[in-house]
C-alpha cells in the first residue's frame, strides 16, 4: 500500500488541499449544519463536486466530539440558508467544529481526486502559531486520528479513509518554506541572504494576521502571535472610501473587484479608484506596523535586529487588471508589503520586506505545506527501505 499524504491549508475565506504533491485545489469553508434526515431538494448548479457538497462525516473508529454530522457547504449552503457558519476569529481554530469538517472534507476530496478510497492517509495541516502548544496539537490528533467515512449525498458516493498520522505546523512558518525553497525543493538563490539571522513572517489572512519569528530559518518557540487585523479590515476601509467619495453603497463583489483591480464596477463600465485604494492600503499598513511594533516589544527583539519581513496571505496582494483595448496589464496599486516597507524603513532603513516570490501570496502556506509533506514522505519511505 502506497503512502498517501494530504496537505491542507484552512483559511478564513477558503481552503486548499493537495494530495501526494499533486495540484493545489481550492474548496469552500462556509457551512450549514443540518440534521441527518433533513430534506435538501436543491438542484446543484453543476456536476462539479464543489456544487454538490451535501455530506455526512462519520468517525467509524474511536470517539469524536464532533461527528457524525451532516453539513452543506459552498453554494448549496448559501442557497439553503443565509445563515452560514464560517471560521471565527473569536475562538481558537483548533477548537472549532468547522475546522475538523473542513480538514476531513479536504481529505475526502483529495482521496476522490487520487482514487485512494479505503486507504491510510497522513495529514499535514496548519494552525495559527499562537495555538501551537502540546495540548492543542494533542487535541487535534485525538479528533483526526482514526477511520472516517464521508458520504456525498448528491453524488451518491461514499469515500472512506484512515488517518494514521497528523503533523501540525504553524501558519506563516509553513509559508516561509515556500519563500526559502523552490517547488522542486532546491534553495532559492535570491533568499540566501536571509538563511541566517532573524526573519519575521507576516501572514495576512481574511480575518487575522499571524506573526512568527524565525532564526536561521527555524521557528522560535513562543514567538507566534495573532492579531485581529486582516483582509476584512482592508475591505472595510475600502468600503468607507467608496462611500466617502461617491456616496454609493456597493456589493461585496464590487469591493472585491476594487481590491483586486483598483477600479469599481460602475454601470457598464468602471470607475478608477486606485487613489482611494492606495490610501486604504496605507492606512492598513500603518495599523499593521503598529501591531508589528507591539509584537517586537512582546518578543524582546528590536526591528533593527531582523534582516527581512516575509509578507504573504490573501490580504497582501497587489491590484491590477488587463486592459483589453491596450492589450496590457495595468497595475493600480502595490501590495501591502510595499507600504509596510515604507513604515519599517523609518525605523531601520536596511530592513527588507519580501513578497512571495511565485506570484499569488495566498498560495504560500499551501505550497510550503506541500514541501513539508514531500520531505515527510521521503523520510517515511527511507525508514521503510
Q: Where is each model-derived feature located?
A:
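Nucleotide/phosphate-binding catalytic cleft detector across ATP-hydrolyzing
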Residues: 1-199, 221, 277-282, 286-309, ...
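C-terminal amphipathic alpha-helical segment
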Residues: 236-297
